[in-house]
Every structure is written in C-alpha cells, then in structure tokens.
Amino acid sequence: MSRVFITGSADGLGRAAAKLLIDEGHDVVLHARNRERAAAVADLVPRAAGVVIGDFSSATETMGVADQVNELGRMDAVIHNAGIFLEPSRGSTAEGHATTLAVNSLAPYMLTALIERPDRLVYLSSGMHHGGSGSIRDIDWTQRRWNASKAYSESKLHVTALALTLAREWPGVLSNAVDPGWVPTKMGGPAASDDLELGYLTQTWLAASSEAAATVSGGYWYHRQRQQPAREAADPAFQRKLIDRLAGLTGITLRT
C-alpha cells in the first residue's frame, strides 16, 4: 500500500480521489485550506494518515504545508490537485502575486521543491492548457489587462510543463499531468458534461497502481489515455525558462 498526499482534498476531485485510495487501503494525507474546510472531510479523517492545513495563496502557508507533510514522513506519491478557476480579478497575495498564479503555479512548484521527493508525482492540468501563452514575460499579470480564462490556461500550461520537466530531470520519479475533463464539481459547475469518476480515477491510477501502463513518466493523460500536450509544455527551452522564473518569484530552487 502507498502513502499518498493529496492537495485540495476537502471537496471535488481531490476528496473523491482521497476516499477511493483510503477505501483501497492506502495511507492518505489530506489537505484543506483552513480548519473550516477540513470539516468537509471529517468523515474521512479517522481513516486518513493525517490532515495538513494551509492556504496556497500564501507563500508562508504553502511552505508550512510542506513542513507538515515532511513531519509525517516520506510520501510514495503526491497528487497536486488543488487549484482555483476563473478568478474575477487578478487579486494580490501577501507577496504581491496574482492569486491564480500563486495557487495554481507557484504552490505546486514550491511543494515539489520542498516536500521530500516521492516515487510518483501527479499534477492536475486541464485541456485549457492548450490556450496558455508560451511567453513567461508577464506570467504574474502586472502589465496585461486581467483575463481570467487566459490566466487559468497559462497556470495549467505551467504545471503541465513542470510535470514533464521532472519526468526528464528526475529519472527516479514517475511524473505525469492529468486532464480530468470538464467534470461536475464545485469548480466545474453542474452543467459539466464529463465523467466525474473517470476524472479522479486517472489520478489515483497514476499515483498508486502497479499496472505497467500506470508506471510510466512524462505523460499527459485524459481518462487513462495518453494525449498530446501543448508544444510548449514539452519544449525543454520553455521548461527551463519557466522553472527559472518560478524560482525567481518564490526564492526557492528546484533541485535536479
């Protein structure tokens, strides 16, 4: 059985993935933004390996989450599931970053750099990453007029590129990105037409399955089928520029 940490596991895909893995006998560490949100997984807590608390719009709290996870011991897998969707404005974190960038891009990068290296990494992407910009000149939206859809697409391009970077730079780790589809969660809304179960089954499969098809690295997946990611996501030159930019924005270096 595996030890798995899942970010954003208080509801939606993260909660569904956590429940399935717990039901299968895995040791799952849950995450919630705050203690009030943690109440949403009160039914899972008695069977979980732990619960960590932290708001990913805060760099300080994100680092605190990494510390909490490391105190619990090494994980076999980490599922970077947490994210926010169409924010009405750029917002500004305590560090001055756009909220979408902080939660969807900077937090997964920071956690990856700070949490003891697991055997498997899974990053929640989106088909919308194909609409992301291959430029990192203004990824923090300090110069452009705010565009919620574009900002979200770019953030998902970032995590897809991060997953594929690590597949190359960390050969001992299986690193993959997953498009869960447009599923009927709080984020996706009731009109979403994709299959919720297939949305979370792919991430749990990549995180814990011993099937040969799941023990691969460098994939971009949709419903257990490998897909073609955006060109930039797989471009080593773009990947290097992105990682350097994320390191500069966070002050944290990703060790290779």
Predicted segments — roles?
Residues 8-11:
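Conserved glycine-rich cofactor-binding loop
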Residues 14-15:
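N-terminal Rossmann-fold NAD(P) dinucleotide-binding loop
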Residues 105-106:
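Ankyrin-repeat alpha-helix packing hotspot
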